[in-house]
A protein has these predicted regions:
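Active-site gating/metal-coordination segments in enzymes
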Residues: 2-11, 80-137
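An N-terminally biased module of ancient metal coordination in phosphate/nucleic-acid-related enzymes
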Residues: 2-81
Length: 137
């Protein structure tokens, strides 16, 4: 459950219910995000929304609570092309997560290798303009 606060920050449900359905062994949460913590991993100035902090520890606790074995962590648009929160989560996952990064067209081979070494296996293309572009086209 997500709730919009009066300050424009999206707040997360503090106590999600355990689902009645049990995922099969080895099940993967195939699309999830880490958000911040903003003091360590600031949100992009051009972001279209501001989430409450929901870092790697919260994500991994939710994964375990829901009964998933692994995650595919997708770079959140609120972090723009700064993949540090994603990479931090991947490195802390003990091999239980892979990532999808957002990159600039001029990314270097060395930067791509660093993302790969952290566990990134895909690139996110943002075609939904409402997530990344203030002006509808």
């Amino acid at each position: 459950m997500v709730e919009q606060t009066d300050k424009g920050v999206i707040s997360w449900h503090p106590n999600p219910q355990t689902p009645a359905y049990v995922p099969p062994a080895g099940a993967v949460d195939a699309h999830c995000h880490v958000f911040g913590p903003a003091k360590q991993f600031p949100f992009a100035p051009e972001r279209k929304y501001t989430p409450g902090d929901a870092g790697k520890d919260m994500l991994f606790a939710l994964r375990d609570h829901l009964g998933f074995a692994r995650n595919v962590i997708v770079q959140a648009t609120c972090h723009g092309r700064d993949n540090r929160a994603l990479v931090d989560a991947l490195r802390a996952s003990a091999g239980r997560a892979r990532g999808v990064a957002s990159i600039a067209p001029d990314i270097t081979d060395a930067e791509l290798q660093e993302l790969h070494d952290a566990g990134v296996r895909g690139i996110r293309f943002n075609f939904v303009k409402r997530l990344v572009d203030a002006t509808p086209k």
